[in-house]
A protein has these predicted regions:
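Local cysteine-cluster metal-coordination motifs and their immediate loop/turn environment
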Residues: 7-23, 50-67
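Small-residue-enriched alpha-helical segments and adjacent helix-cap loops
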Residues: 2, 7-44
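Short flanking/linker segments adjacent to small metal-binding domains or redox-active Cys/His motifs
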Residues: 56-78, 93-103
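Short, low-complexity, polar/charged sequence segments that are solvent-exposed and flexible
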Residues: 28-32, 68-70, 83-85, 92-95
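Short Fe-S-cluster ligation motifs
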Residues: 44-55, 82-103
Length: 103
């Protein structure tokens, strides 16, 4: 089966992940930021930004998983999530400093 997108960003908007998040750290705001960035760049047909209710990484949130790389990123805010977007789509340097390091 051929997948319809080249890159998929899954952003946790679950209650536990976002319970202590403030300001630009909330999952919904991160999702909105990346959706707007994606639209501005005209990548909507090949890059998809989605909200998910739980990635089961609540203590490390806000979190995002990117496919097809399979990398999970943690402790994000809007600026760092945008840096991850740019890195994963080839427009910026890799961000290993934001990768989930394990439990």
């Amino acid at each position: 089966m051929k997948y319809p997108f080249q890159t998929l960003f899954l952003i946790c908007t679950g209650e536990r992940c976002n319970a202590e998040a403030r300001g630009d750290e909330r999952g919904e705001l991160i999702r909105d930021e990346l959706k707007a960035h994606n639209k501005t760049l005209g990548r909507k047909p090949t890059v998809r930004v989605c909200a998910v209710s739980c990635l089961d990484l609540c203590d490390y949130g806000p979190n995002m998983v990117v496919q097809p790389s399979g990398i999970a990123y943690s402790h994000l805010n809007r600026a760092t999530a945008r840096a991850v977007y740019d890195a994963e789509t080839g427009d910026g340097p890799p961000r290993p400093d934001l990768e989930f390091e394990g439990r």
